[in-house]
């Protein structure tokens, strides 16, 4: 029976790993050297393949290999019924199969090929990974005019083996007629760069942002054959933004080639004009912002201590107006409600911007592509994305900059209802709070609303169109009135000034906003995999305690409704299904028996890490290490997938046993 290509590749990989483990190649070299010395002394004799095989058989090496490479007869049957496992050595050395794509013959395409990497000196001492050995990998993510791509992972090395090609449609969406192909002049007016984001994934699955680069591709418009090669130097991020991390050799090719090319002088002139126009707009906005700030300080000198953030640095330490980080973002079919959008942002990982040495909170607001590809970011990254999504759903949303407990700087999102209702959204938890201001002039006997939110002070709010600074006598959130049209309470910036540097297409230097991508994770497969790993970890843990383990599959299944109810509550704020869950548990636990359950939530899929966290809870440790008569254990895992690689992982451990006291 012929194996499918993916199974044949996996089989080759397993055989290769087994041969490597047994060092068959080394044994063959030893036999070859010995045979040449002892049996083939004369120059006239030549060592044939048959002679070498005979020598290998005589030494028992062939028999040893065949004994090791044994395959069970029912393996094919098991593969049809169980979840297919990937090859243990996941780095595919075979040539990648070409994937068919729909190419519009009336459109122009840019084929970007990443040929290889050079001078990644941080990995100079790293050797090539052995087959089956886990290793850190590089992944390259691209975005160009609403198109996103991701390379296959390659092992981290001084010269990483990047070999990937990406077909980019040049005049996507609005530019160009449907029946007219973009010419060189039209393409020269497209100032969108190709954004490259390089990620590093370590052996535990943690991702690190290595570099974020904007590639200017329009030099190809001046080449005769529509082909050019570039050496793209990648710089680090944050405090290392001036340090080179490596070089990518890139080949650009236009399909179909241009009938008429442009001179390099014309291209350089266009790029120079764009830079000059951008610099002038940025200069004028800076002049205006300084004047606006002086006016704000004249209202009340104490305003100097309020958190009024006009500019923020991105991962490349480029200063940009905060309004440029916001733009209405529609999620298409990926998210259905604003609350689901808040849940999606909540399950993206939280990680403070890295810093070298001590000091205050580091400044780094990531571009949207870098945040989405890394799948984690700081509080500001979460807030910016949530605000973009809420604007996309038609809400009047703003990012708030202020402080929470102990004076710690913090950001959150605010929406203003048509009826004037103010709602705060915490991007890191998905919680929502209704704001009802306290009137400090009311007499003491008047009952005041008690705020439930953790926010203490607020300095400013902003969106993609507006920037307003808090000019009320007190900046405490609980007494603030959020009537943003009242200029006596909120000092606005000129919307025209903001538009000149923050609206789409206003500046060539503005990073374009990428679309969201659907999840590539299979929820059922991921749930099964994590659950199996947790069962093994529990088994090992109890074995160390000299305890036997008996699993109750039916009880495990009955935990599913509880996990579903928890996720629904996190998404909608409504609790449902708890009565049915409790009734089923009562029926499953006999009289005289005790039931204990422990649910916990994660935003990663690392089973060992999750298990270690669970054991730190005394209540969970009591369940996992439980002793008793007729003791049965249960565990249920449910993975809920969201756009990108985001997921909510719910785990519930439970046990039932008969009380003997």
Swiss-Prot record:
Gene3D superfamilies found in the cross-reference section: 3.10.620.30
Primary location group: cytoplasm
Subcellular location: Cytoplasm, Cytoskeleton, Microtubule organizing center, Centrosome; Cytoplasm, Cytoskeleton, Microtubule organizing center, Centrosome, Centriole
GO cellular component: centriole; centrosome; cytoplasm
Keyword Membrane: no
Pfam family name, one: CEP76_N
Stored InterPro entries: CEP76 (IPR052299), CEP76-C2 (IPR028926), CEP76_C (IPR056288), CEP76_N (IPR056289), CEPT76/DRC7_peptidase-like_dom (IPR056290), Papain-like_cys_pep_sf (IPR038765)
Keywords: Cytoplasm, Cytoskeleton
GO aspect biological process, one term: regulation of centriole replication
Its job: Centrosomal protein involved in regulation of centriole duplication. Required to limit centriole duplication to once per cell cycle by preventing centriole reduplication.
Family note: Belongs to the CEP76 family.
Protein name: Centrosomal protein of 76 kDa
Source species: Xenopus laevis (African clawed frog)
